[in-house]
Amino acid sequence: MGRAGPRSTADTRPRATVITTRRPRPWQKPTSPRRLHRRRPRGQPASENAAEPSQVAISKGKSPDYANGGKAAMDSRASDAINKSKVDTSASNPSQRRPSRLRGKRSLALPPRLECLFPSSCGSRRATSRPGFPPLEGSHLGCQLLPL
């Protein structure tokens, strides 16, 4: 019994550290190769098969630039395609895109339709001035939403 005590703690302590050190790697490493792998087939087949109209139609922004050998890279069309790709990446993550000023106003004031749906969540005077709201302390409904 005396041998099992320190052995169990010695087993658990390295295990915990090993788990914490290894956890970020599966989350961080596969994302970058996956993204690169997704982006590569869009551009490279267009450069190989630029003569086919179907390929040109599928990859709109990139194929003409690849077909010209990068001559149109300084063209406005190329810069537009680059800007569009940046906008797409930020659009998938709206928390980074929105400025903090807008987020503050949005969280404070819901649109009127949502105020009607959630009178308990926001402190709008129109919703709280109803005769049946807020419910009495002894009511069995508690903090549920009012039936509309």
Swiss-Prot record:
It comes from the Eukaryota. Residues 1-108 are annotated as: Disordered. Residues 22-42 have a biased composition (Basic residues). This is Uncharacterized protein CSNK1G2-AS1. The gene is CSNK1G2-AS1. Residues 88-97 have a biased composition (Polar residues).
